[in-house]
Amino acid sequence: MFGLGGQELVLILLIILLLFGAKKLPELAKGLGKGMKEFKKAQSEIEEELNKAVDDTPEKEKKSSSEKS
């Protein structure tokens, strides 16, 4: 995971704890979770749109592009 070991992750968590305090951590985690959920949703929507665009390509274009390869 990003080339970080266990010690580095523990150090980062301790620094976050010192900066924000124990009371703010649940709020930060909740916000981070929501942000990641929205990011994954947007990513899947983009993938679906790209797949639809590829699937909607007429057969002639697919054949001509595969013949060029």
From Swiss-Prot:
Residues 48-69 are annotated as: Disordered. It holds the Pfam family TatA_B_E. It comes from the Bacteria. It is found in: Cell inner membrane. InterPro entries: TatA/B/E, TatA/E. One of its GO terms (molecular function) is protein transmembrane transporter activity. It is a single-pass membrane protein. Keywords: Cell inner membrane, Cell membrane, Membrane, Protein transport, Translocation, Transmembrane, Transmembrane helix, Transport. GO terms for cellular component: TAT protein transport complex. One of its GO terms (biological process) is protein transport by the Tat complex. The chain crosses the membrane at residues 1-21. Forms a complex with TatC. HAMAP family: TatA_E (MF_00236). PANTHER family: SEC-INDEPENDENT PROTEIN TRANSLOCASE PROTEIN TATA. Belongs to the TatA/E family. Part of the twin-arginine translocation (Tat) system that transports large folded proteins containing a characteristic twin-arginine motif in their signal peptide across membranes. TatA could form the protein-conducting channel of the Tat system. This is Sec-independent protein translocase protein TatA. It comes from Chlorobium phaeobacteroides (strain BS1). The gene is tatA.
